[in-house]
């Protein structure tokens, strides 16, 4: 079938017309009722009256501009055309472009093209971020006739919606061109992608709820943009672990690195949060779409202002009755008490929880972690770095836990002078030769190293036998994202954890350590994390080039780069160690009631001891064992 560009666009939109109507709160089917939306307007809408540091403000602007660049490129499907290469240029979307982009972002395009073309949106995203001005597949000619393939013949009486169902969307020329395109000729700019993933990670921290609450929490979390940015860079290092924060503008990501990174970990994170930003309207993207009428106003930027809103006043979409836009005062948009700024932890934050949540989703874990179902059980900085203290705090929790361990890479001075480290090193088997360089190209002496272990089963005293199941996994959080899942084995059955309170510490992916008289020795697995008994030093080991005699409990890295086949260790001095319980609201309430009861019992016992002290002292004085002056008696 031959038709013009606009006819093709018209065939796409009926498939999602009802969705778009409800989302945009359109009050008319008249195309003249809406106009364009600029990226600058969206940023202004969200930052109005909000105190955010200048760098965060600039990077949010860049992220929204990049988002609009991607949406504009996708929104011109099936005749995509890249806009200007200038990142600072304000990008505007028409309603038609917004609608078509939403078809892809919402995932509804799969109904049109089939699941075989699921990678198409990642190609569009990569091309849009690659800044290749020559990647326009079609002439910009509205009068040119295009041929579109059909599944079924078009009849004269068919409506546009019926015609859309008869089009073979998967057979479009653009799909063929994308399939044959050598994507490796393109290079993605990680500095652009970093701003976008920071926006997505911030969105990840916001649970699905009413729109006004989601937007309030988004605005609140903007104040910690730099924390989200730090973890976003760690996520991007999953694609290329050589990315440096100081030199991002001169670095690139290849299509191979990008596609493997997306497929192995990041695709669910990007897909879910891209949809949340646009479809759930966290950024209020659709609000500045407005009716063109005599009652509309103009603000100082040259954009029109929706009816009912005043210039310089923040607005949010009304949740019920679909009544469009309603003005709210700054007091009404302040974040409520339910928005927590921190967890009372030096290590764990809202941004870190969002980071872990995104990784667990990408791995396919059934365990969900949010700021609402996590409770701190142990913190070394509060309770002391003691194996007994750790044991007392975590053994009463009967749901999954997350163990965080963080510190600084061991330096040569510690190796040469710290006797406690030397004793630990003597009991931990060496793999590398003394003359080998222990640091790989992506490892630096000043690295902050952070690992997180997901323990699905309750903690057990395991001085003789390991415990655990195959849902256990190790997450590398800093300086780069990576993950190590439990190896499926009918023999091991995921029993890969020990908690040894008799002098050998904690092991994840290790065999039981030897601890007899003066003979102590660790047996680390090829992929393992070992924490010595004083909770002072830790070692993560990854042997990827060859198999050793050690039992393998965890799978090796699936990093797209050469890391999967590398032998390396992260040895670090522990500065923070925390354990957090993950459970339902019911489990949290039951655990809190149990802790409260135990505190009351402890206070009662202390009270009894104080009351009985007088009687006990009297007997001791009568026996002459304690003098009246309280300094002891004489015989």
From Swiss-Prot:
| Protein localization | Cytoplasm
Database matches in Pfam families: TLD
Keyword Cytoplasm listed? The answer is yes
Could you list this entry's UniProt keywords, alphabetically sorted: Cytoplasm
Question: Residue ranges of the TLDc domain?
Answer: 346-583
What domain of life is recorded for the organism?
Answer: Eukaryota
PROSITE patterns, sorted: TLDC (PS51886)
Major location category of this protein:
cytoplasm
Region: Disordered; residue ranges are: 297-333
Q: Which residues form a coiled coil?
A: none
Q: Does the keyword Flavoprotein apply?
A: no
InterPro entries registered for this protein in UniProt: TLDc_dom (IPR006571)
List the record's Gene Ontology CC terms alphabetically. cytoplasm
Its biological purpose: May be involved in a process influencing telomere capping.
Membership in a protein family: Belongs to the RTC5 family.
Indicate what this protein is called per its UniProt record: Restriction of telomere capping protein 5
Q: Which source organism?
A: Lodderomyces elongisporus (strain ATCC 11503 / CBS 2605 / JCM 1781 / NBRC 1676 / NRRL YB-4239)
Please state the gene responsible for encoding this protein.
RTC5
